[in-house]
Amino acid sequence: MSRSPRPVGLRRRWRTAAGYWIALAGLLLLASAFTGIDHDEGQYVAAVALMRHGLPYRDFAYLQTPLQPLLLAPLAWWCEGWLFPALRAVNALLGAGAVAMLWLAARLAGASNRGAALAAVALASSHMLLFAASVARNDALPLFLHCTGLWLFLPVLRADARHRTLSAWLAGLALAGAASAKISYGLPAAAVGAFALLHVRTLGRGPVLALAIGGLLGGLPTFWLWALAPEAARFGILDYSLKAPFEWRMLNGQATMLAAPLSLLRMLRFLAQGCGLVALVTIGVALMQSRRAPRTQPAWAADTPLRRMQSRLLLLLILAGMIAAWLPRPIYVQYLGPLLPALFLHFGLIAEGPLQQRWVRALVALAMLAGIAQTGIDIAGNLIRRHSPVLAATRDARMAGQLIRARHAEGAIVTLSPERAIDSGIPLDPRFATGLFLFRTRSVMTPDQSQAFHALPMDQLGRGLDGAPPAAILTGMERAPSRIAPDGLDAPLVSWARRHGYRRVILPATGAALYLRPRT
């Protein structure tokens, strides 16, 4: 008996998709090894390492919702000595996973093969995804969870779908989990919840209730740690982001970075680093055309009740994602994370017609190149020199640990660059868990709050270190001058180390300066 051609074709399609995913994962792993170090990585690497000894908020400061360090905590033991590169590798795989989940969501939503591929490649080539998957920040995990939640929620819209209640529960868990990993994903999660409530008669009470229960479970990590240390959690999740970036920019005469005109330009620029801007314009044009001629839809845009419901859901998610991207100041590319999945999914569903025109295909290809360009430029030099910044930092961290242990120095290591010290085997002073971010604040915390939140701002440095002299101080990565720190943020640490007779050693792989406590 000959086999049916359909299963054979289906298997071939899945094998092809798996091959593309493996290639993408390999490229993202390569990028993670050769991308330069971003100082934002410090607090996320430190938080995972400090999970060996405590919990976010209660035992060390953390400036986001807490799912990522909780979920990745086992790596602090499994990858000891290699934690920084391991966290980058995990993010690379999560980034590739987000692309796979978006492709699955597009296929489930009824996109053609080309439309689903377009949605996936648009996300994969966006600067936002490439940045999230190349560094050890907290952008890849919530993006993956959000794309997974979107894929899981789509069957709930189908009256004939199996296991709708289970799918709704898992969707709520994933979407709320994304918000528990990064607070800005709370807006799209809330948008899905609002959509479900507005369509409760169509979706049914069971799936809507399951979605809500899943959402509550996904939020449990945040609720739990908030209950353990409510003031510190509120500060880390809400207050810091509402106060500290504004204070820093104002003190340094950079108020224009916070203003709406420049914020709009920055948002458009980041959307243009990939297919975001093209997708937004295409969706806008399609909406205007559908309103002008609602009864003359082409075959590729078949108008069905399910398609209309999907469109309403995605448009609501796009709106929520745009608000989530707009609210933080200054705007950076990673803030597009809550916006891009729904945007590219909708783009894949409606782009079949526009893609028949050669100039549209050329524009999409150009947008994809624009998204890849910055990452390509950033890693090209390191690839040519065969220099991996993350491995160089790990080598220096290990050398620092050897030097500190050779002096039998007790105590912790102090640094504004925790990602460069975490693999030394020497405990990090938890007051520096956020790297430079709480250190550089002026009036964001009172002295009592800084003590309660396990932080040590610059103006309290002398008193704080005098009371607990560190085994070593690692500097050299925060030398950029600013108005309130003309010699760089590392300068107060260097000054304190010199006054107390610490011996300087230059680490060979990165040129960082390690100050060792004098023998007693």
Q: Locations of the language-model features?
A:
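Short periplasmic/luminal acceptor-recognition loop of GT-C membrane glycosyltransferases, typified by
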Residues: 190, 274-276, 390, 394-444, ...
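Membrane-interface alpha helices of multi-pass inner-membrane proteins
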Residues: 119-120, 165-183, 188-195, 215-216, ...
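Transmembrane-helix motifs of polytopic, lipid-linked glycan transferases
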Residues: 89-110, 125, 148
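Membrane-interface transmembrane helices that cradle and orient dolichyl/undecaprenyl
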Residues: 107-110, 149-170, 197-200, 277-293, ...
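Membrane-lumen/periplasm interface segments of specific transmembrane helices
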Residues: 208-250, 323, 327, 334
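Hydrophobic/aromatic-rich transmembrane helices and adjacent perimembrane loops
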Residues: 132, 139-142, 187, 322-359
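Perimembrane helix-loop-helix junctions
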Residues: 158-159, 188-219, 286-300, 345, ...
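Hydrophobic, aromatic-rich transmembrane alpha-helices
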Residues: 100, 266-308, 315-322
